[in-house]
């Protein structure tokens, strides 16, 4: 049980600045965009290796040639690999700022993008991973083992992110009680986890019936488990003289950059591998 007493003066202070909540929301949006782009790049690269002449668009990958559906597993594989790479980079920075927070969100969304297809494998027949799985001809029931592994992966990511988010508190009193920890993670993780994917919508418009945009509101659902995990997370210690975090333009700038690249580059359809003479479908 927590025994630290919070002074009346500290209790009356604003718990988390609105600016930093907005910064976290835009950082979450950047993480969503990077995760989706990596997923699509994984599909495109695997398709190119399989000789399926892929075209990378802003919201999907289309194959112009037939071939093995095993290439459709490339998206989930690339997402998990990217999540692991970003995870190794995350501790390299000792500053708790907008850049580090953006990397954290990117890690979480990459793992979510990779583990979710595994978790829902037995329940879908037309998803890319399901179609890739059907080519393997494995015994019935194995898909449930894969689903369990994906579910455990999703829960592990959600639970492990609780102390990572709590470490952004500007003072110990903010996270010294279970209710304080739940409140802080709700503000910095749950709200941005829901709002961030919505901020990413312009990057993927027009949707063109791909179903990506309607699915975006569900991308941050895992943060519900993060808030619940924060209730019992007591190991995070905040150093003295930590500067309170506020608004940063960095995640917004990155989101605008990705939106411009998406609309003026990927929307035209990029051939994979690209050709210098005719890099886009509309230039062939």
Spans of features found by a protein language model:
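An N-terminal structural lobe/cap that precedes and organizes the functional/catalytic core
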Residues: 16, 21-26
